[in-house]
């Protein structure tokens, strides 16, 4: 029992609504404690409706805008949402929309990954392609390759941790320095955005290195998978 919210999705904004249903069913059929539960779904001629629990605490983006989280809290929340992401990958899916807005905090103070609207199934080679991208969080391979792998999600999760550790102002101040879209794209491709050498003073160097591994511009130099990401985070001490 409890409050629920209804998410209303325009079918016209989904390239293939049948494919959307099939991938959603594959994900929702196997629940995970760190994924937002879907209570039920239905549709009419124009919309898809999805019912899910109401999260009164809101998203990690909301929480970090109101207070500073400790290193321990950020690592704990990160391991939790990454556990949900690992489950998604194990089902042959890529999320494609990892960001602080899409990590909700439950009443039990646990992180749940949400919003599977861009999630796509991988082909037999482990590739998939998103229908859209979030312009503030873009992996460099977007500009050089049509085939995306789970490393797309690993980069996005690294960028998410970078934002959680340094704060939204630190992140957005870097964004405002670009004079053109070409400057922004070039900074992503060359690894100059976000600034991997610019962390708040209290962030442990070991944690900085782990996050920067996820943010490597070369996918083969990122974490091989989410479990490797989680294992490294679990070894970080606060001081």
Annotate each language-model stretch with its function.
Residues 1-15:
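ATP-binding glycine-rich loop module of kinase domains
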Residues 14-29:
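AlphaC helix of the eukaryotic protein kinase fold
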Residues 40-41:
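A short, aromatic-enriched beta-strand patch in the conserved N-lobe beta-sheet
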Residues 45-59:
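Conserved short submotifs of the Hanks-type protein kinase catalytic core
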Residues 60-69:
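AlphaC helix of the protein kinase catalytic domain
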Residues 77-78:
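Activation segment signature within eukaryotic-like protein kinase domains
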Residues 89-105:
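Catalytic-loop of the protein kinase fold
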């Amino acid at each position: 029992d409890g409050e629920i919210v209804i998410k209303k999705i325009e079918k016209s904004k989904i390239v293939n609504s049948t494919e959307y249903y099939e991938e959603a069913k594959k994900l929702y059929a196997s629940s995970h404690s760190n994924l937002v539960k879907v209570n039920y779904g239905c549709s009419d001629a124009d919309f898809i409706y999805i019912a899910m629990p109401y999260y009164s605490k809101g998203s990690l983006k909301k929480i970090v805008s109101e207070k500073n989280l400790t290193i321990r809290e950020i690592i704990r929340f990160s391991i939790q949402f990454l556990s949900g992401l690992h489950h998604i990958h194990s089902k042959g899916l890529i999320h494609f929309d990892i960001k602080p807005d899409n990590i909700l905090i439950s009443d039990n103070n646990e992180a749940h990954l949400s919003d599977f609207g861009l999630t796509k199934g991988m082909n037999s080679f482990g590739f998939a392609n998103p229908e859209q991208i979030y312009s503030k969080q873009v992996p460099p391979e977007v500009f050089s390759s049509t085939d995306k792998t789970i490393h797309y999600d690993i980069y996005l999760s690294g960028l998410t941790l970078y934002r959680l550790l340094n704060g939204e102002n630190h992140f957005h101040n870097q964004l405002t320095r670009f004079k053109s879209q070409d400057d922004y794209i070039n900074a992503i491709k060359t690894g100059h955005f976000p600034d991997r050498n610019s962390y708040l003073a209290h962030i442990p160097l070991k944690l900085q290195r782990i996050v920067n591994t996820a943010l490597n511009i070369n996918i083969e130099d990122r974490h091989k998978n989410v479990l490797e990401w989680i294992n490294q985070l679990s070894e970080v001490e606060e001081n």
